[in-house]
């Protein structure tokens, strides 16, 4: 057979890089934390915007994030991965971010969604690239969820995210916070 050998997770790792198991556990941990945070952001937004014109859009995105969280809950349990120790922080911070941006207005809530989902799109793409055929289930899950996150980002843009007061500052801060949360939740 002259066919190319299927890619395996962490096959090209260098000395000092995480082992395959550590890499995959970190991915599951951070993705579980991220989906938990996303659910909390939408809960915060809904607490403020319930009954308004943005409610149906936010509720639909929240339901998809809940499905993502359920998927990572299953993996955390099946693979016996330790969840992040920062869950209490993400519980409060996610709700506060959602409610805080919603208090500015529906466009700011959409700007928050756009910023978070843009970072998650990049994050999930990088993860999928690292996963080989031996982690096809996880890779497929991440790619499926990534499509939803991109759709959320695009919907937030359609709903006027760029019209939010202080759009550049707001989205820059949310992106920086999202990247920090990813870095911390992978490790802690």
Regions found by a protein language model. Give the residues of each.
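Non-heme di-metal
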Residues: 1-188
């Amino acid at each position: 057979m002259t066919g190319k050998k299927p890619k395996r997770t962490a096959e090209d790792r260098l000395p000092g890089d995480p082992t395959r198991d550590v890499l995959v556990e970190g991915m599951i941990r951070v993705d579980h934390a991220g989906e938990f945070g996303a659910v909390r952001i939408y809960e915060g937004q809904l607490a403020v915007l319930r009954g308004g014109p943005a409610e149906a859009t936010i509720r639909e995105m929240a339901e998809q994030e809940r499905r993502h969280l359920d998927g990572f809950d299953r993996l955390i349990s099946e693979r016996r991965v330790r969840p992040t120790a920062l869950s209490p922080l993400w519980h409060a911070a996610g709700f506060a971010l959602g409610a805080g941006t919603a208090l500015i207005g529906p466009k700011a809530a959409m700007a928050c969604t756009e910023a978070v989902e843009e970072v998650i799109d990049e994050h999930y793409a990088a993860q999928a690239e690292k996963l080989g055929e031996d982690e096809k289930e996880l890779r497929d899950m991440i790619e499926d969820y990534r499509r939803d996150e991109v759709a959320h980002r695009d919907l937030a843009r359609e709903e006027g995210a760029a019209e939010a007061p202080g759009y550049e500052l707001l989205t820059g801060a949310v992106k920086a916070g999202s990247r920090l949360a990813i870095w911390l939740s992978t490790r802690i």
